[in-house]
Design a protein with these regions (language model features):
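Helix-turn-helix
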Residues: 31, 35, 39-72
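Hydrophobic alpha-helical connector segments
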Residues: 87-129, 155
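A structured, mid-to-C-terminal "fold-capping" secondary-structure block
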Residues: 164, 171-216
């Protein structure tokens, strides 16, 4: 007998997705996901609960357990809907296609900043998450001599960490005296080329370029 979470994942994947006998459900998994995403976009992942999703859909808290039995199951639905299908990945060569992939995935994280709060515990479970990995694997030719799955997971991690940094930046300028204090205590750091690192997009681009250069 499958758990509720397993049944939801099977439904997302189209595995054993035959319609259950009995009355037709009023809501679809997409409706549950959309309601939960709306709450998370407004108040963060911590604001999401089964009770709040039920309230948004005008159903009782008891009724929502017919669709999802836990927040973990709900998050599976949310992630799959939020990342969505990967767009067409284009570029003049495979490295440029990897950069395009990173940029497009980063856009999804900006649309739904709460995604960076979901810490991976292994390979993903949702079909759309696998779709993004597959898109990058297909963007790299076989003769590139690259472990494409590892590359996809590495770049996904860079995007995730950068999204958290971007969300956490306060925009406040550092104290005016801090530069001199750093130079006095850490002269090697002061002598190194130094530039503003407050632009997460630029930092992500630098990190991705460093990874791709290392694969040449």
């Amino acid at each position: 007998m499958h758990s509720q979470r397993d049944r939801v994942l099977r439904l997302l994947w189209g595995v054993d997705a035959a319609t259950n006998r009995g009355p037709k459900a009023r809501w679809k998994p997409q409706d549950i996901a959309a309601a939960a995403i709306g709450i998370a976009d407004e108040g963060g992942l911590e604001a999401v609960s089964l009770a709040k999703v039920a309230e948004r859909l005008d159903m009782t808290t008891t009724a929502i357990y017919r669709y999802v039995d836990s927040k973990a199951t709900l998050i599976d639905l949310m992630v799959d809907a939020a990342v969505g299908d990967p767009p067409e990945i284009t570029g003049r060569d495979w490295r440029q296609r990897c950069r395009t992939w990173v940029r497009l995935l980063a856009d999804r994280y900006r649309e739904h900043p709460w995604l960076c709060d979901i810490r991976p515990t292994g390979m993903p479970r949702q079909p759309h998450a696998y779709g993004w990995i597959d898109a990058l694997v297909r963007a790299v030719p076989d003769d590139a001599d690259v472990h494409t799955l590892r590359l996809a997971l590495l770049l996904d991690g860079l995007v995730r960490n950068n999204a958290g940094l971007e969300r956490g930046l306060s925009g406040e300028a550092p104290e005016p005296w801090l530069g001199e204090a750093v130079a006095a205590r850490f002269p090697a750091l002061a002598a190194a080329p130094f530039q503003d690192v407050s632009d997460p997009s630029a930092e992500l681009e630098y990190a991705v370029d460093a990874v791709l250069r290392g694969l040449s």
